[in-house]
UniProtKB/Swiss-Prot annotation:
Protein's organism: Rhizobium meliloti (strain 1021)
One Gene Ontology biological process: oxidative phosphorylation
Known pathway: Energy metabolism; oxidative phosphorylation
Biological function: Cytochrome c oxidase is the component of the respiratory chain that catalyzes the reduction of oxygen to water. Subunits 1-3 form the functional core of the enzyme complex. Co I is the catalytic subunit of the enzyme. Electrons originating in cytochrome c or a quinol are transferred to the bimetallic center formed by a high-spin heme and copper B.
Cofactor: record remark: Binds 1 copper ion per subunit, denoted as copper B. Binds 2 heme b groups per subunit, denoted as high- and low-spin.
SUPFAM superfamilies assigned to the protein according to its UniProt record, in alphabetical order: Cytochrome c oxidase subunit I-like (SSF81442)
Protein name: Cytochrome c oxidase subunit 1 homolog, bacteroid
Residues given in the record as heme b 2; high-spin binding sites: 404
Length: 539
């Protein structure tokens, strides 16, 4: 009987969660255990509905396809779902900043909803995109089925459980108060187990490959998986107050704690949001334009430069703090050095279109990927510039930093993920084309306009903030109180919410387009000017 082991494990887990809820040392841990119990119970019921009690027929149900794409399909759907959720929460957070009365105490105030937004976009949307695409890419480039059988399912569902536990924990107020590492110790332990399984599945597939060469995209994926594991374990070293309680204390304190946190925080950007998505760039752009990578040698140089330099750049988040000055300067120097290899990768991605530049005009998926690479180039110039101490003295703690982060996260990570989804969906579900190519074009313009409005407004707001904070009168007193600087941000915060709403509208359009494609629908529409005629809808 299929799924017997899985059902037993889920049932035991649900029972232990119930015991944990009953013996909890604090109210929050008890509430979280109830969340875990219902999540595992739901998983058990879903599996029970899929159980086939008939004996397996040799050679028929047991026959395996060449590639394990079912888990990739689930990953693509999860990426779209969590993306819409994350962007929606982001718009809510933006509106809360502009209109404080929208803060609903205690569960939906800004302090709890903001980490929900960042984690939903980075780890739920971005993480599912990376897991799904890495499983797809490693199988194709290795010419081998995903290693470990149902291990891929464990990685996928285990990661969804992590997302649910983290998100519910934020709303309950269970947090370590460490940016991008808010989940408490028991959620961190679960993610560690899932991540090790992810590494085993990915590395095992490479080791049993039939293709002698390891394609460069797999280098970037593997670097992302290994480095994130190291960062996660070290930064989340903590001592629980009780094994049946939600509270723990970090193994680090003071300046060491701050440095460890931003060693983790910046390299989460460097390896989660950069290396992993560069792997997507190096696979999906050549596939979509049907051209080889412009310079494979440059891609290898790009890889090793990123690996060596990025890990040192974290201290630039701690300029003008108690961190030793030499450490701040070290972070600044390595940040500036990162500019050149980052732009080398950008040039490599853009020049892959050599001989196919017309596709930017005729193929909105290519246009989306190219815009993503352009935002990558812009963000990797702006980041090193902001790490320079003189510039940082103005930009630090202002909304300029928020604009920088979103131009990278939405412009680079968001658009390259959207492009990958549009590439994958017709292939995974054996469709001739997407439901609507023109909707992709609309999505492109909504997303691009939303990012530009958001980032530009935050750049202006941040510079104004920095200048107001440092404005002194003739007697050496501050000209503006902090409350006045906050009040001055109101029009910018409203415009930011509008930019986020445009980006969300594009994501909703994508969700509809993807859903209709999965259902096998095709919209009868005129081709984009200059493009080849679209296949006619089936009768």
């Amino acid at each position: 009987m299929k799924h017997t082991v899985e059902m037993v494990v889920l049932s035991v887990g649900a029972f232990l969660a119930l015991v944990g809820a009953g013996l909890a040392q604090d109210r929050l841990f008890g509430a979280h255990m109830w969340v875990l119990f219902f999540a595992l119970l739901a998983g058990t019921l879903v599996l029970m509905r899929r159980v086939d009690f008939r004996p397996a027929v040799a050679g028929h149900p047991g026959r395996r396809r060449e590639y394990f794409d079912e888990v990739v399909k689930y990953g693509v759907v999860a990426t779209v779902f969590w993306g819409v959720v994350g962007f929606l929460v982001g718009v809510v957070v933006a509106l809360q900043l502009a209109f404080p009365e929208l803060n609903v105490e205690p569960w939906f105030n800004f302090g709890r909803v903001r980490p929900l937004h960042t984690s939903a976009v980075i780890f739920a949307f971005g993480g599912n995109a990376l897991i799904a695409t890495s499983f797809y890419v490693v199988q194709r480039t290795s010419r081998a089925r995903l290693f470990g059988g149902d291990l891929g399912w464990f990685v996928f569902w285990g990661y969804q459980l992590f997302i649910v536990l983290a998100a519910s924990g934020y709303l309950l107020g269970i947090t370590q108060s460490r940016e991008y590492a808010e989940p408490e110790w028991y959620v961190d332990l679960w993610l560690t187990i899932v991540w090790v399984a992810y590494l085993v599945a990915f590395l095992g597939t490479i080791m049993k490959r039939k293709e002698p060469h390891i394609y460069v995209a797999n280098w970037f994926y593997l670097a992302f998986i290994v480095t994130i594991a190291m960062l996660h374990v070290v930064n989340n070293l903590a001592v629980p107050v009780s094994f049946l309680g939600s509270k723990s204390y970090s193994a680090f304190s003071g300046v060491q704690d701050a440095l460890t946190q931003w060693w983790y925080g910046h390299n989460a950007v460097g390896f989660f949001l950069t290396a992993g998505f560069l792997a997507m760039m190096y696979y999906f752009i050549p596939k979509q334009v049907n051209r080889p990578v412009y310079s494979y040698r440059l891609s290898i140089i790009h890889f090793w430069a990123i690996i060596f330099m990025y890990i040192w750049a974290g201290p630039h988040h701690l300029h003008y703090t108690a961190l030793p000055d030499w450490a701040q300067t070290l972070g600044m120097v390595f940040s500036i050095m990162l500019w050149m290899p980052s732009w080398g990768g950008m040039i490599n991605g853009l020049m892959t279109l050599s001989g196919a530049w017309d596709k930017i005009r005729t193929d909105p998926v290519v246009r989306m990927m190219v815009m993503a690479v352009a935002f990558y180039g812009m963000a990797t110039f702006e980041g090193p510039m902001m790490s320079i101490k003189t510039v940082n003295s103005l930009s630090h703690y202002t909304d300029w930093t928020i604009g920088h982060v979103h131009s990278g996260a939405l412009g680079w990570n968001g658009l390259i993920t959207f492009g990958a989804i549009y590439y994958l969906v017709p292939k995974l579900w054996n469709r001739e084309r997407l439901y609507s190519v023109r909707m992709v074009n609309w999505h492109f313009w909504l997303a691009t306009l939303g990012i530009v409005v958001y980032a530009a407004v935050m750049w202006v707001a941040g510079i104004q903030q920095g200048l107001m904070w440092r404005e002194y009168d003739d007697q050496g007193f501050l000209v503006y109180s902090f409350a006045e600087t906050v009040a001055a941000m109101f029009p910018y915060y409203v415009m930011r919410a509008a930019g986020g709403a445009l980006f969300l509208a594009g994501a909703l359009l994508m969700a509809f387009n993807v859903t209709m494609t999965i259902l096998g629908r095709v919209r009868d529409e005129e081709p984009i000017f200059g493009a080849a005629p679209l296949p006619a809808p089936a009768e």
